[in-house]
Amino acid sequence: MFNSDIQYYMRQQHNIKIGETTAEKIKIAVGAVIPDLDEEPEPYVVNGPNLMTAHPVEAAVTYQEIAHCLDKSIAKLESSILHVLELTPPELYSDIVENGIFLSGGGALLRGLAKRFTEKVNIQFHVAEDPLRAVARGTCIALKKTSNYSFLMR
């Protein structure tokens, strides 16, 4: 989702064609979801063919641009989070409010994501320790203790 947003943005705003790999590199280098960061990454320089001439061109992409181009997708996620919270049983909801929500996966590394979600939802969001491996580690723990999680095995 985010990589295709970046590819589309680069076509529309910089008239440059980039692939999935380059979009991923941009996301890692300058990926952000808020326009004001305390620690600003340097702009990321992208090379690719101009869409009109096919001549090679270079474009410097800033984190503010990426925050702008990801805004609609992040807003959809915010809406989904709010919807899920509306459907959450009260007992679980109080645990969530008390402990917060932990973000995992590569998207959790987008600069400002936890802050933006916290401000939108009014519940503390945290980036999991080692977010790229957090789900796999949690699954491993659950599989070792399946008796504790029998309610999940339906």
Regions flagged by a language model, labelled:
Residues I16-E20, E86-Y93, Y149-L152:
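Active-site phosphate-binding and catalytic loops of NTP-dependent enzymes
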Residues C69-V97, A142-T146:
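Phosphate/ATP-binding catalytic cores across multiple sugar-kinase/actin-like superfamilies
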Residues K115-I141, Y149, M153-R154:
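Conserved phosphate-binding/catalytic loops in two-lobed NTP-binding clefts
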